[in-house]
Amino acid sequence: YTMNADNSFISYINSLHCLDGNSDGALAEMQATSPYFTGIQVVHPWVKVLEEKLLNGKEHVILTGRAGDGKSTLALSLYKKLKGIDSEKPLDCGLNKKEEVPYEKKRIILIKDLSEWTVEEQDQLLEQMTYGHDRYLLVSNTGTLLDMFRRNATDKVAMESNLLTAISSSESQSQEFQLRGDKTVKVCVHNLGLRNNSDVALKLWDNMVATMEWNKCETCSIAVSYTHLRAHETLMN
C-alpha cells in the first residue's frame, strides 16, 4: 500500500507485514496499546481454554511454538480476560514480563516471554512453580523451554524425551516432571505452532477489510487505482 499522510491506519497496516524493516505493528508490545489492533483483532479460541485450565485446573500451563506465531498476542488477550478488561480497549502500556492476577485464594501468574528472563531467574521461576499454590502460564519458544527444564532435571535424557513428546503433539499434553531436590512440577503443554490457525486468519482479514478506517481513503486522489479500496467500497455499499 502507498503511504497516506491523511490516514494513519494505512501506516499501521504497513507495519504488520515483513516486506521491509517496519514491522513494529506485529509486536505484542505495540498491539497492547494500539487502538487499530483492538479494532481488527480476533480473540483466539484458545483464550477460553487456557483460562479454564488456569482457574480450575491443577497444572501450570505452557504455551509454546515458533517465533512469531502469536503466543504473546494470545497471552495479551488472556490477561485482559482475567483482569476483566474489554478486549477492544487498548492498554496504557505493554505487559510486564511478569503479570499477577489474584483469583480467589491464589494468583494467576503470566510470564509473557521466558526468553526475557536470565538463566538464574528462569531456574528460580521453575522452583516457585513446584510450590503448587499459584498457577503459572509460561509463554516460551521451544529452545528456551527445553534448556530450562534440562538444567533442572534429575534425568536429563528422560526429561528431554518427555517434554519433546508433549511439544510435538497437536493436542494438549499433561506431564509431571521430576526436578532436582526431589521436587515435581505438573504442566499442560500447548503448542500454538501446530494448530491450524487459518480460521483466525480469515476472521482477521474480514475485520481488516470491514473496518470503517478505509473510508478516510475516499478523499485520496489515487484511491481508485487500488483494487482493495474499490472492493471495500462495493462491500460497504
What residue ranges belong to the model's regions?
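Post-Walker A helix-loop "phosphate-sensing" segment adjacent to the P-loop in P-loop NTPases
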Residues: 81-89
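Phosphate-binding P-loop
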Residues: 52-58
